[in-house]
Structures are given as structure tokens and as C-alpha cells.
Swiss-Prot record:
The active site is at residues 50, 125, 149. It comes from Sulfurimonas denitrificans (strain ATCC 33889 / DSM 1251) (Thiomicrospira denitrificans (strain ATCC 33889 / DSM 1251)). GO terms for cellular component: glutamyl-tRNA(Gln) amidotransferase complex. Keywords: ATP-binding, Ligase, Nucleotide-binding, Protein biosynthesis. Heterotrimer of A, B and C subunits. One of its GO terms (molecular function) is glutaminyl-tRNA synthase (glutamine-hydrolyzing) activity. GO terms for biological process: translation. This is Glutamyl-tRNA(Gln) amidotransferase subunit A. Allows the formation of correctly charged Gln-tRNA(Gln) through the transamidation of misacylated Glu-tRNA(Gln) in organisms which lack glutaminyl-tRNA synthetase. The reaction takes place in the presence of glutamine and ATP through an activated gamma-phospho-Glu-tRNA(Gln). Belongs to the amidase family. GatA subfamily. It comes from the Bacteria.
């Protein structure tokens, strides 16, 4: 597969031929189920788009039955920026319903397979985007990351996945899960492509009140030879598998070899991250998903009266995991429990942000696992709690609003990809990409 950097240099005719060949290749591999639809419109470089990002005149459903029949009437800001830069949305990729999941098993369209082992999950919620890039069925893709939904599937599928600083990329046109945590980001074959796509989609947007007034670009200033001070977390990785620990040691040695300074640091117990994240995310999801009632748009189940129509539409339209999180969100916001749960979660969130601020007073980057294990087999995570714990290493980054990037490092004893993440201080994407490019070149991962 050609890279994004190479594709941007192709002529119009060369691109057209490439896109037709790519479409044929995708149609010849339907079992992967990475794509929901292939549109192949426009004459720009084709980019796969997660099914929760609005593309005008496309069916956009967030992987849910409740949005069947909805056609997007406008483009998300990231799509407008792509079109202006010579990129074209190519097809919509599968995802966990409303981005609530870590395996892409909860999609209305069925599960997506991991391109490295069809018995394993691709990760989630951006599993379709990760599988498409990992299988050579996309040059690059857009995903969204609420608690690791770009980085974890990128790690599982052996690609690069980047979550920008909160506010760096406009959320206008993104189907909201948890508004204070969501971010759109690039999923690519390599770090340089991620920097290029990040530059294209980032920047201030008046349509998003949380958008940052920062428009600096990184791809034309990449410097893998820059010496960086990087924190490692020896205690934090104790819950990781032996394969992940070996990959972590491999990355540390690679960073030392090229002259980066390695220092030890410590984060608070991750159990506090998980509690704060799921209380915050489900509370916000409860509000965001209240709009889906079958009246204004999407799938409607007609009941005996208006109230019954609401009940039947939401009961039949939402999947089990979405219902579970709506119930949890309503509980933590309810009278008598708001102070005990939601308020404490926000206090914990401030502590998480403060601990990162203190670490970044002395270092430029933090090296961390993305997931405790490699991709699990389908059905292996038998309880919701097991799935939630798989987000152990990613969710604190979203709670603190920081940028992070997953870079493929090695493979497990069973041949499954292992990615690690670099985390930077807020708005320091330049250092993040410089460090990631340096690590990528020294590791020289071969998918």
C-alpha cells in the first residue's frame, strides 16, 4: 500500500486507477467487515471515515440500529478540511455502537475481524478504521478517541493511531459520546503520514466552542534527531502481560540507543482512572443520547402512543452496551448519588490532570503501554468489567486532555502486534511526533 505522502503526489488519473483497484480489493475481502459502505466519490486521495463522522449525503449511523435511515445533511469540519487539502472520504468504517466498546463487537453491522488473526478482535471503538489500514485496504483513516478508541485498535492492528490534544481538532460533525473527552484523530501506516493528516484536520473552528485557538503545523518541522527527555513507568506496567513488558523494554532500549534521556516516573493507581472515566463518560453519554428518540431522525418504532413510541424506539434501537451505559449515567446523575459519584469523579479528574502536569515539569514525553495485552479472541472478555479494564492505560490521557500516539513496536509470541504510546503535554504535538518518528525509525517494525 502506498503511503499518504506518496498518494498526495499522484496525478488525477493515477488516483482514479488506484481507487478503483482499492475498491475491488475491498470487495474481494468482505469477511474482514472493516467497511460498512464504499462510496468512492471525489477525485482526491481516498481516506476511510469512521461511521460517527458526518459526510454529506452519506448514511451515518454510529454503528447503531437507531440511526438506520439517517442521511447526513452536512459535512463535519474535518471533512471540509480534508476536501480543501485534496483528500476525499472514501468509505465509512465499522465501529462499536456509539463508540461504546473496545472490540467492535457491539456494532449493528456485525463484528470486524483483526487482519492479523481472524479469531481476534481489532480493538475498538475505531476497529473498522484500524482493520482497514492494517489490512492494506486504506491509505489512512479517521477515528475518534474517547478513552483509547484510536490508540488501542491501532496497537492491536499494528498501525499508528494518534489522539490530539482536546480542542486541537474540531468536534463539529462528530457523533458525540462524551463531549469533554471525544477527539477525532488520524490512523495511518506510519508516523509521518499521521503528522500530515493531523495537520490537515487540526485548527480552530468557530463551529466548535471547545476548539483551541491554535493552528501551528508539525509535519514540515519533524525532527527525529532531536534529543528528548522521556519518562518511563516501571510500576505502572505491572499489570501488563509478559509480551507487552518485553515490548516496553525493547522501546526503552531503542530510545536510549538514539540518545534520548530516560527517567523513571510514577502515576497514581489506574483504578481511580477507570472509575473517574466511566462515571464521567456515561453521565455525558446519557445527555448526548437523549436526542435519539425516532421523532426527528433515524429509525422509529411506532407504539400505542407518543410515550410508547419513545420507549419502543429506544428499547429496540439501542444495543445492550449502550443501554448499560445510559443506565449507569442516569444513576450517577440522579438525586442522592450526584455528589457521591459524579462530583467525586470530577475531583479525581483534576488530580489526574495535576499529576501529569507535575511529570511534564521535568520531562518532554511519557512512554506507556496502550493495552495490558495483545488483541483478545472474540468472546474472551466475558463481562463488561473485563472490557472496561482493557482501557487501563489509555483513559487517563483523555481525562487530562493530552495528546498521545500509539506506535507499533513488536509482535507477541503468537504473532500479534504490540503498540506502545507516547504521551505529550497539552498542545505539544510537535514533540510528540518528533519522539514517535525517532522511535519508529529505530524500531523499524515490519508488519
Amino acid at each position: 500500500m502506498i503511503t499518504l505522502k506518496e498518494a498526495l503526489k499522484l496525478s488525477k488519473d493515477e488516483l482514479e486507477n488506484f481507487k478503483n483497484d482499492l475498491k475491488a480489493k475491498i470487495e474481494a475481502n468482505p469477511e474482514l467487515n472493516a467497511y460498512i459502505d464504499i462510496y468512492n466519490i471525489g477525485d482526491g486521495v481516498p481516506i476511510a471515515i469512521k461511521d460517527n463522522i458526518q459526510v454529506k449525503d452519506w448514511s451515518v449511523t454510529s454503528g447503531s440500529n437507531i440511526l438506520q435511515g439517517y442521511i447526513a445533511p452536512y459535512n463535519a469540519t474535518v471533512i471540509e478540511k480534508m476536501l480543501s487539502a485534496g483528500l476525499s472520504p472514501f468509505g465509512r468504517t465499522n465501529m462499536d455502537e456509539f463508540a461504546m466498546g473496545s472490540t467492535t463487537e457491539s456494532s449493528f453491522y456485525g463484528k470486524t475481524l483483526n487482519p492479523h488473526n481472524k479469531d481476534c478482535v481489532p480493538g475498538g471503538s475505531s476497529g473498522g478504521s484500524a482493520a482497514a489500514v492494517g489490512a492494506g485496504l486504506a491509505i489512512a483513516a479517521l477515528g475518534s478517541d474517547t478513552g483509547g478508541s484510536i490508540r488501542q485498535p491501532a496497537s492491536f492492528c499494528g498501525i499508528v493511531g494518534m489522539k490530539p490534544t482536546y480542542g486541537r481538532v474540531s468536534r463539529y460533525g462528530l457523533g458525540a459520546y462524551a463531549s469533554s473527552l471525544d477527539q477525532i484523530g488520524p490512523m495511518t501506516q506510519n508516523v509521518e503520514d499521521a503528522a500530515i493528516l493531523y495537520d490537515i484536520i487540526s485548527g480552530h473552528d468557530e463551529k466548535d466552542s471547545t476548539s483551541a485557538h491554535k493552528n501551528d503545523k508539525v509535519s514540515d518541522k519533524l525532527n527525529p534527531n532531536r534529543k528528548i527527555r522521556i519518562a518511563v513507568l516501571p510500576k505502572h506496567i505491572q499489570n501488563a502481560s509478559e509480551d507487552v513488558k518485553k515490548a516496553y523494554e525493547l522501546a526503552i532500549n531503542a530510545l536510549k540507543k538514539v540518545g534520548h534521556e530516560i527517567v523513571e516516573a510514577e502515576l497514581m493507581d489506574a483504578k481511580f482512572d477507570i472509575s473517574a472515566y466511566y462515571i464521567t463518560a456515561t453521565a455525558e453519554a446519557t445527555t448526548n443520547l437523549a436526542r435519539y428518540d425516532g421523532i426527528r431522525y433515524g429509525n422509529r418504532v411506532v407504539g400505542k402512543d407518543l410515550n410508547d413510541t419513545f420507549v419502543q424506539t429506544r428499547s429496540q434501537g439501542f444495543g445492550d452496551e449502550v443501554k448499560r451505559r445510559i443506565l449507569l449515567g442516569n444513576f450517577v446523575l440522579s438525586s442522592g448519588y450526584y455528589e457521591a459519584y459524579y462530583v467525586k469523579a470530577q475531583k479525581t479528574r483534576h488530580l489526574i490532570k495535576d499529576q501529569y502536569s507535575k511529570i511534564f515539569e521535568n520531562v518532554d514525553l511519557i512512554l506507556s503501554p496502550v493495552a495490558p495485552t495483545t488483541a483478545n479472541k472474540f468472546g474472551e472478555l466475558s463481562t463488561p468489567m473485563e472490557m472496561y479494564l482493557s482501557d487501563l492505560y489509555t483513559i487517563s490521557v483523555n481525562l487530562a486532555g493530552l495528546p498521545a500516539i500509539s506506535v507499533p513496536i513488536s509482535k507477541s509470541s503468537e504473532g500479534m502486534p504490540i503498540g506502545l504510546q507516547l504521551i505529550a503535554n497539552a498542545y505539544d504535538e510537535q514533540t510528540l511526533f518528533d519522539g514517535a518518528l525517532s522511535l519508529e525509525r529505530e524500531i523499524n517494525y515490519n508488519a
